[in-house]
Amino acid sequence: SHIDHLKGLLKLAKEQEVKNVYVHCFMDGRDVAPGSGIEFVKDLESYMAEIGVGQIATLSGRYYAMDRDNRWERVELAYNAMVLGKGEKAASAVEALEASYHDNKSDEFVLPCVVNENGKIKNGDSVVFFNFRPDRAREITRAINDKVFDGFKRETLDLVFVTMTQYDKTLE
């Protein structure tokens, strides 16, 4: 996925007058430079302010949010931030990244961090997951949306969960 895809989704949300749009940022640091995430976040925040739609709710490094080797303890940390509002806290996404960089943790390894607790994923929400790589998206998708998930203890959520591609034939 690319930030332009996210901007397109935010623009569509504005056109459709969607309220309460929250972004859960998965930081990269591998396919782009390891410390470039802060510039992407600044660009995103500027765009959201410009169009008047969207707020960053959480940040997580791909090490946690996009695991692909059934390391559920990592995925659980990202899930807990996005759904339960638990984990590291920061007043802003930029502050969270600056703290991570200060601790010598690049974008890939940003600890799941809650920036806006109002953005927790909850029953009745719609989630648009716009990552195009199925291998990196399956586990967090299962944790959030799979009715028979058993990777760690969590409650089943009643969501509309939409992806940009099929991650796995067993996922609905």
Regions found by a protein language model. Name each.
Residues 1-172:
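…; additionally, a secondary subgroup of soluble metalloenzymes is captured
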